[in-house]
Structures are given as structure tokens and as C-alpha cells.
Amino acid sequence: MPVVHTYCSAPISDGAREALKAAYGKAIAAVPGKSEAWLMCLFEDDAHIYFAGDDSEPCALVDVSVFARSEVPAGAWERFTEEVTPVIARELGVDPARLYIRYDATANFGWNGANF
């Protein structure tokens, strides 16, 4: 049940969405037991985002949530960040210094009318 939610202050083209979806689908395999088969991707563009009090340059926040009953190894998150950062920079025009990626693993995830 991985979910990757991308907020960007700039517009996100259809091509960029496809490229990011593909990158997220590949990178999520860094998390043990996760794959693109259950991945949900959400994209919100033209968001009002300030980074360090400034909204004059594009910036982005990527939220990654996964269903996990045990702790996700820190190395998995590191690998995900390393794999997706250059794609986000290229596709969204966001300087990596203006990008946050936030991770959350939870045992509480619902699907199809029930919780796992």
C-alpha cells in the first residue's frame, strides 16, 4: 500500500507525471515487500508553497506512505530519495535544495472496505 503524493509549486505536465510515476514505481521496490503493483500516485501542481519564506522559485514536497507492521530500514528511504531526486529535478524544474521528501510507515491502512 505505498502512496506517493507530490505537491509542486509549478505546473506538472502529463509527460512529467508519467516520468515521475515510472520513477516512483521503480524506486518503491527499495522498500522491502513493496512494488508498483499496489502503488498509488497523486499529483498536485500550482500549489502555494513557500520554502524558507520564499515562493519565487519552484519547490516541491513528496509524501511517501507505506503499510508496514515493522520499521522500514533507513537504507530503503535513502535509496528512494537517491533514485527519485534527479527525476523530480529534471521533470519539475525543482532544485533539489528546494525539495523535501517525507516518509511515513503505518500499520493502519484501509482498502476495499477493511483494514489490513
Where do the model's predicted regions map?
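Interaction-mediating elements
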Residues: M1-F116
